[in-house]
Amino acid sequence: PTRRPVARWPRWPRKSPSGADPDTLTAQEIKDRIRDAGIVGMGGATFPTHVKLSPPEDKKIDHLILNGVECEPYLTADHRLMLEDPDNIIGGILILKKVLGVEKAIIGIEANKPDAIELMTKACAGRGIEVGALKVQYPQGAEKQLIYALTGREVPSGGLPMDCGCVVQNVGTAAAVNDAVRRGIPLIERIATVSGSAVNEPKNLRIKIGQPLGKLVEFCGGAKGELGKIIQGGPMMGMAAVSLDVPATRGTSGVLLFSEGQVLKEPEGPCVRCGNCVRACPAFILPTEIAFKTKK
């Protein structure tokens, strides 16, 4: 139900006086426009995009990775964006390629989105952009896992994607970059999924940054039943919100509402060192040791 078309209302003018043809701009001028427009990572981390596009001179970047995986349950905002506005995404990718000086760009999309894979593959034809269909598993959208899945490269322990020649950006970030550079539109809105068991009419919405979450839920038919949990973002990596009066931010990829009966409230039990968390960890760390040391 959350894969419905994006609900729309009047937007910023599609082209403002501050928009420019990226072909007439230098890489630094483009980065300045991205910075001035307030563009950040739209996947949820909200790391400043212009900083990510400025690796040290000794770090040779040869791959631009676009994250269209969206592996968090319930969230389908990036999916809808790829289906409804692929040209905006591709325009942003071409700008990012110019800034980084790379020839290789790959969009990673999970195989459970065949419509997006097909559409983006056709839209990218002849533009130096590839689409990689990835196995459906969590956390496929995490930077290190995504880089390994698409390139076979491993980010060094304690390192960053730039240490293996890659820069990763979300597809929503690419679209925002295109809006900022070509049209002069700052980051004042984004696509977000409003869903969960306690939402009457789950939808994807184009939301204004700063709108109270309650207004978004109201647009989706309101909440039903007693609310047990409100989450900004996905159920795995999102942040709990104290109330629906909290404003949406640039990192609000979703607003999830769950009923009281769906929220697990069991007390924490002792670790019996069964090893299940170690086997499940995609980064091969030892969660048991982390838990033990935090309690010490």
Spans of model-derived segments:
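Short acidic, glycine/serine/threonine-rich loops at helix termini
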Residues: 11-15, 45, 51-53, 75-79, ...
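Gly-rich Lys/Arg/Thr-decorated short loops/hinges at beta-loop-alpha junctions or inter-strand turns
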Residues: 64-78, 198
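Hydrophobic alpha-helical positions that pack around
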Residues: 103-213, 219-224, 234
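Ferredoxin-type iron-sulfur electron-transfer modules in oxidoreductases and energy-metabolism complexes
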Residues: 253-268, 276-296
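Metallocofactor- and cofactor-centric catalytic cores in central/energy metabolism, strongly enriched
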Residues: 38, 45-46, 50-56, 78-83, ...
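A glycine- and small/hydrophobic-rich beta-loop-beta segment
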Residues: 191, 219-222, 229, 238-272
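Histidine-anchored nucleotide/phosphate-binding helix
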Residues: 83-99
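Acidic low-complexity segments
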Residues: 1-42, 47, 58, 114
